[in-house]
């Protein structure tokens, strides 16, 4: 289990160019646009008769995703992303583990 604090003091690539406090959140994929070129092409190909026209991917190999931290500078609001290792359980701003404590999911 990976537990990451909600705030981190790290270097700001933006206007600051120095170590500042950053607000940490987890990156989430945005909603896909209906008007991207690939989506338009796919929709056009799918319309009409003829069933499924492109292969549906079924051979999933990975059981986890890499966690991406999105850090926002508290001074200049510049945002940067930091990928960390793969993990099954990710927690943002959870309790710190004390000695001899059992992990609860």
From Swiss-Prot:
One of its GO terms (biological process) is translation. Residues 23-61 are annotated as: Disordered. Disulfide bonds: none annotated. Belongs to the eukaryotic ribosomal protein eL42 family. This is Large ribosomal subunit protein eL42. Keywords: Ribonucleoprotein, Ribosomal protein. One of its GO terms (molecular function) is structural constituent of ribosome. One of its GO terms (cellular component) is cytosolic large ribosomal subunit. The gene is rpl-36A.
